[in-house]
Amino acid sequence: MVLVLALGDLHVPHRAADLPPKFKSMLVPGKIQHIICTGNLCIKEIHDYLKTICPDLHIVRGEFDEDARYPENKTLTIGQFKLGLCHGHQVIPWGDLDSLAMLQRQLGVDILVTGHTHQFTAYKHEGGVVINPGSATGAYSSINQDVNPSFVLMDIDGFRAVVYVYELIDGEVKVDKIEFKKPPTTSSGP
């Protein structure tokens, strides 16, 4: 079992002061093996904070990030899954299923994690999985002014990925669970 925290679109300090205290109390060091971030941290202090939770931190650049060293997209393998990471402002139209599926094919990944819309989504599409963890701070976007803070915790175990979405609604943390299974690859003999 490998725990992967997926979050993004924090926009600190421009659109939000910090992560919600209820989220901060849940995100403790030593529990999570990987963090993947869809960008728009905006300041180095958020990067440093995430490193205290887990040193294995993968970040892609959002259009408001100060650190130009973050790549546009990134792929990594966790367990049996190949994950792709992209902020999403490059995908036109934003959040479009077919455009995201094309990016997923281009990256050759089982799970594509993208952001930019600030709205949580997770679905199977064209044989893959697309996840948007939303905005971890509830920062507004050009699409939506009223955003519930959210993040995703993935439990990857073999060919199974359980996606838990944590969303702060009316001051309470609500958790939903979605399970995805990757069919095992079979090799055919000569």
Curated annotation (Swiss-Prot):
<protein>
    <recommendedName>
        <fullName>Vacuolar protein sorting-associated protein 29</fullName>
    </recommendedName>
</protein>
<keyword id="KW-0472">Membrane</keyword>
<dbReference type="GO" id="GO:0031902">
    <property type="term" value="C:late endosome membrane"/>
</dbReference>
<dbReference type="InterPro" id="IPR000979">
    <property type="entry name" value="Phosphodiesterase_MJ0936/Vps29"/>
</dbReference>
<dbReference type="GO" id="GO:0005829">
    <property type="term" value="C:cytosol"/>
</dbReference>
<dbReference type="GO" id="GO:0009734">
    <property type="term" value="P:auxin-activated signaling pathway"/>
</dbReference>
<dbReference type="GO" id="GO:0005771">
    <property type="term" value="C:multivesicular body"/>
</dbReference>
<dbReference type="InterPro" id="IPR024654">
    <property type="entry name" value="Calcineurin-like_PHP_lpxH"/>
</dbReference>
<keyword id="KW-0963">Cytoplasm</keyword>
<dbReference type="GO" id="GO:0043231">
    <property type="term" value="C:intracellular membrane-bounded organelle"/>
</dbReference>
<comment type="similarity">
    <text>Belongs to the VPS29 family.</text>
</comment>
<keyword id="KW-0333">Golgi apparatus</keyword>
<keyword id="KW-0927">Auxin signaling pathway</keyword>
<dbReference type="GO" id="GO:2000012">
    <property type="term" value="P:regulation of auxin polar transport"/>
</dbReference>
<keyword id="KW-0813">Transport</keyword>
<dbReference type="GO" id="GO:0005794">
    <property type="term" value="C:Golgi apparatus"/>
</dbReference>
<keyword id="KW-0967">Endosome</keyword>
<dbReference type="InterPro" id="IPR028661">
    <property type="entry name" value="Vps29"/>
</dbReference>
<dbReference type="GO" id="GO:0016020">
    <property type="term" value="C:membrane"/>
</dbReference>
<dbReference type="GO" id="GO:0006623">
    <property type="term" value="P:protein targeting to vacuole"/>
</dbReference>
<dbReference type="GO" id="GO:0007034">
    <property type="term" value="P:vacuolar transport"/>
</dbReference>
<keyword id="KW-0653">Protein transport</keyword>
<dbReference type="Pfam" id="PF12850">
    <property type="entry name" value="Metallophos_2"/>
</dbReference>
<dbReference type="GO" id="GO:0001881">
    <property type="term" value="P:receptor recycling"/>
</dbReference>
<comment type="function">
    <text>Plays a role in vesicular protein sorting. Component of the membrane-associated retromer complex which is essential in endosome-to-Golgi retrograde transport. Required for the auxin-carrier protein PIN2 sorting to the lytic vacuolar pathway and the PIN1 recycling to the plasma membrane, thus influencing auxin transport orientation. Also involved in the efficient sorting of seed storage proteins globulin 12S and albumin 2S. The VPS29-VPS26-VPS35 subcomplex may be involved in recycling of specific cargos from endosome to the plasma membrane.</text>
</comment>
<dbReference type="GO" id="GO:0042147">
    <property type="term" value="P:retrograde transport, endosome to Golgi"/>
</dbReference>
<dbReference type="GO" id="GO:0030904">
    <property type="term" value="C:retromer complex"/>
</dbReference>
<dbReference type="InterPro" id="IPR029052">
    <property type="entry name" value="Metallo-depent_PP-like"/>
</dbReference>
<comment type="subunit">
    <text>Component of the retromer complex which consists of VPS29 (MAG1), VPS26 (VPS26A or VPS26B), VPS35 (VPS35A or VPS35B or VPS35C), VPS5/17 (SNX1 or SNX2A or SNX2B). Component of a retromer subcomplex consisting of VPS29 (MAG1), VPS26 (VPS26A or VPS26B), VPS35 (VPS35A or VPS35B or VPS35C).</text>
</comment>
